[in-house]
From Swiss-Prot:
Keywords: Ribonucleoprotein, Ribosomal protein, RNA-binding, rRNA-binding. CDD domains: Ribosomal_uS17. GO terms for biological process: translation. GO terms for molecular function: rRNA binding; structural constituent of ribosome. One of its GO terms (cellular component) is cytosolic small ribosomal subunit. The lineage of its organism: Bacteria, Pseudomonadati, Pseudomonadota, Gammaproteobacteria, Enterobacterales. Part of the 30S ribosomal subunit. InterPro entries: NA-bd_OB-fold, Ribosomal_uS17, Ribosomal_uS17_bact/chlr, Ribosomal_uS17_CS. The gene is rpsQ. The keyword GTP-binding does not apply. This is Small ribosomal subunit protein uS17. NCBIfam families: PRK05610.1 (NF004123), uS17_bact (TIGR03635). It holds the Pfam family Ribosomal_S17. It comes from the Bacteria.
Amino acid sequence: MTDVIRTLQGRVVSHKMEKSIVVAIERTVKHPIYGKFIKRTTKLHVHDENNECGIGDVVEIRECRPLSKTKSWTLVRVVDKAIL
Protein backbone atom coordinates (compact mmCIF):
# COMPACT_ATOMS: atom_id res chain seq x y z
CA MET A 1 0.00 0.00 0.00
CA THR A 2 1.40 3.38 -0.98
CA ASP A 3 0.73 6.46 1.09
CA VAL A 4 0.18 9.70 -0.78
CA ILE A 5 1.66 12.80 0.84
CA ARG A 6 -0.99 15.52 0.88
CA THR A 7 0.09 18.91 -0.45
CA LEU A 8 -1.95 22.11 -0.46
CA GLN A 9 -1.53 25.73 -1.53
CA GLY A 10 -2.66 28.67 0.55
CA ARG A 11 -1.99 32.24 1.61
CA VAL A 12 -0.01 33.23 4.72
CA VAL A 13 -2.20 35.22 7.13
CA SER A 14 0.14 35.37 10.16
CA HIS A 15 3.87 34.96 10.79
CA LYS A 16 4.15 36.32 14.35
CA MET A 17 5.37 33.03 15.85
CA GLU A 18 8.94 31.78 15.77
CA LYS A 19 9.40 29.14 13.02
CA SER A 20 5.62 28.95 12.51
CA ILE A 21 3.10 30.50 10.15
CA VAL A 22 -0.68 30.37 9.77
CA VAL A 23 -1.89 29.53 6.25
CA ALA A 24 -5.47 30.06 5.04
CA ILE A 25 -6.72 27.45 2.56
CA GLU A 26 -9.75 28.53 0.51
CA ARG A 27 -12.08 25.98 -1.05
CA THR A 28 -15.52 26.14 -2.64
CA VAL A 29 -18.35 23.90 -1.51
CA LYS A 30 -21.86 23.55 -2.85
CA HIS A 31 -24.67 24.46 -0.46
CA PRO A 32 -26.68 21.27 0.18
CA ILE A 33 -30.11 22.90 -0.23
CA TYR A 34 -29.71 25.98 -2.43
CA GLY A 35 -26.91 24.76 -4.70
CA LYS A 36 -24.91 27.99 -4.48
CA PHE A 37 -21.13 27.63 -4.33
CA ILE A 38 -19.73 29.13 -1.12
CA LYS A 39 -16.12 29.92 -0.16
CA ARG A 40 -14.92 28.15 2.98
CA THR A 41 -11.60 28.91 4.68
CA THR A 42 -9.47 26.56 6.76
CA LYS A 43 -6.55 27.91 8.81
CA LEU A 44 -3.58 25.59 9.34
CA HIS A 45 -0.51 26.06 11.52
CA VAL A 46 2.60 25.31 9.44
CA HIS A 47 6.25 24.78 10.40
CA ASP A 48 8.56 27.33 8.71
CA GLU A 49 12.11 26.31 9.65
CA ASN A 50 13.93 29.35 8.17
CA ASN A 51 11.29 32.05 8.82
CA GLU A 52 11.25 32.85 5.09
CA CYS A 53 7.53 33.68 4.67
CA GLY A 54 5.72 36.98 4.98
CA ILE A 55 2.06 37.90 5.19
CA GLY A 56 0.32 37.53 1.83
CA ASP A 57 2.77 35.01 0.35
CA VAL A 58 1.30 32.06 -1.54
CA VAL A 59 2.94 28.88 -0.24
CA GLU A 60 2.88 25.15 -0.86
CA ILE A 61 2.65 22.96 2.26
CA ARG A 62 2.69 19.23 2.91
CA GLU A 63 1.44 17.04 5.71
CA CYS A 64 3.97 15.59 8.15
CA ARG A 65 4.09 13.96 11.57
CA PRO A 66 2.68 16.05 14.43
CA LEU A 67 5.29 18.62 15.47
CA SER A 68 3.20 20.11 18.29
CA LYS A 69 -0.39 20.20 19.51
CA THR A 70 -1.55 22.20 16.48
CA LYS A 71 1.24 21.83 13.87
CA SER A 72 1.23 18.85 11.51
CA TRP A 73 2.10 20.63 8.24
CA THR A 74 5.47 21.86 6.95
CA LEU A 75 6.47 24.43 4.34
CA VAL A 76 7.62 23.05 0.97
CA ARG A 77 8.23 26.25 -0.99
CA VAL A 78 7.11 29.83 -1.48
CA VAL A 79 5.14 29.92 -4.74
CA ASP A 80 4.59 33.69 -4.95
CA LYS A 81 5.98 36.48 -2.76
CA ALA A 82 3.57 39.24 -1.72
CA ILE A 83 4.20 42.73 -3.04
CA LEU A 84 4.27 45.16 -0.12
